């Protein structure tokens, strides 16, 4: 399969790399590793928000050559933190992110899927942390959703599961799976190894800015690889037909 994004010897001073890899259309790729591994730095680089050593090719062209407005049509990026806009209704904030403003049904569908239907009229700065996280997720999904944007290709998510309960995480997983089935590539950072083991197609395991392992989730999330990354021992178990990782240290 042709790659959507290629990274070649990408590096950030003291924080990242050099590392190389690729992202394929319609896949879910998880970035995993301990705090300080470089996941957020790598996502920002892939989003075109920072530049440094190495090359990032997106859809056949160097990421540095993409005009910001055009890039926003093709990729959406959820930063780890973002303050809510002052006194802006949620529906207005979401509409700003949706390229085709006529797709009101899509906005309502995404809001309903994430449990936001009763929050659309509220001001963004009056939401709880978990509510605001779901609003931000809805915004980036609307930005590149194929029903509102035929150019959408890539969704980058930095710790998207933060502040979400189990039911909300499950709802987000369903939405991401739907996007994936429509050809959108999804790259997200995660601290939940068992979530990665269940939902990722591929994984990159990082430690101190270095890529320790990359490939299919089963090939990457092995006890030896995880011990190298986290400095502790792991076991992989099968529990009622589901694979599970547990620490043994």
From Swiss-Prot:
Residues involved in ATP binding: 33-40
Molecular function (Gene Ontology), one example: ATP binding
SUPFAM superfamilies named among the record's database cross-references: P-loop containing nucleoside triphosphate hydrolases
UniProt-annotated location(s): Cell inner membrane
Domain ABC transporter: 5-233
Protein topology in the membrane: Peripheral membrane protein
Claim: Translocase is one of the keywords in the record: yes
Domain of life (superkingdom): Bacteria
SMART domains: AAA
GO cellular component: plasma membrane
Catalytic EC class: translocase
Keywords, sorted A to Z: ATP-binding, Cell inner membrane, Cell membrane, Membrane, Nucleotide-binding, Translocase, Transport
Binding partners and assembly: The complex is composed of two ATP-binding proteins (BtuD), two transmembrane proteins (BtuC) and a solute-binding protein (BtuF).
The family this protein is said to belong to: Belongs to the ABC transporter superfamily. Vitamin B12 importer (TC 3.A.1.13.1) family.
NCBIfam families assigned to the protein according to its UniProt record, in alphabetical order: PRK03695.1
Role summary: Part of the ABC transporter complex BtuCDF involved in vitamin B12 import. Responsible for energy coupling to the transport system.
Protein name from the UniProt record: Vitamin B12 import ATP-binding protein BtuD
């Amino acid at each position: 399969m042709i790659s959507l994004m290629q990274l070649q010897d990408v590096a950030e001073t003291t924080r990242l790399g050099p590392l190389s890899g690729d992202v394929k259309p319609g896949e879910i790729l998880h970035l995993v590793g301990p705090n300080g591994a470089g996941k957020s730095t790598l996502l920002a680089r892939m989003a075109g928000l920072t530049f440094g050593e190495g090359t990032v090719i997106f859809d056949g062209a160097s990421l540095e050559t993409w005009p910001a407005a055009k890039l926003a049509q093709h990729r959406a990026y959820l930063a780890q933190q973002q303050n809510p806009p002052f006194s802006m209704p949620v529906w207005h904030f979401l509409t700003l992110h949706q390229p085709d403003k006529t797709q009101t049904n899509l906005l309502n569908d995404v809001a309903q899927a994430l449990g936001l239907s009763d929050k659309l009229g509220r001001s963004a700065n009056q939401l709880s942390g978990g509510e605001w996280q779901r609003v931000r997720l809805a915004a980036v999904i609307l930005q590149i959703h194929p029903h509102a944007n035929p150019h959408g290709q890539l969704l980058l998510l930095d710790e998207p599961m933060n502040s979400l309960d189990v039911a909300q995480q499950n709802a987000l997983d369903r939405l991401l799976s739907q996007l994936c089935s429509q050809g959108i590539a999804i790259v997200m950072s995660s601290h939940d190894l068992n979530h990665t083991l269940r939902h990722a197609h591929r994984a990159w395991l990082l430690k101190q800015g270095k890529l320790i392992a990359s490939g299919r989730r089963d090939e990457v999330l092995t006890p030896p690889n995880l011990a190298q990354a986290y400095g502790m021992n792991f076991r992989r178990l099968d529990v009622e037909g589901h694979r599970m990782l547990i620490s043994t240290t």
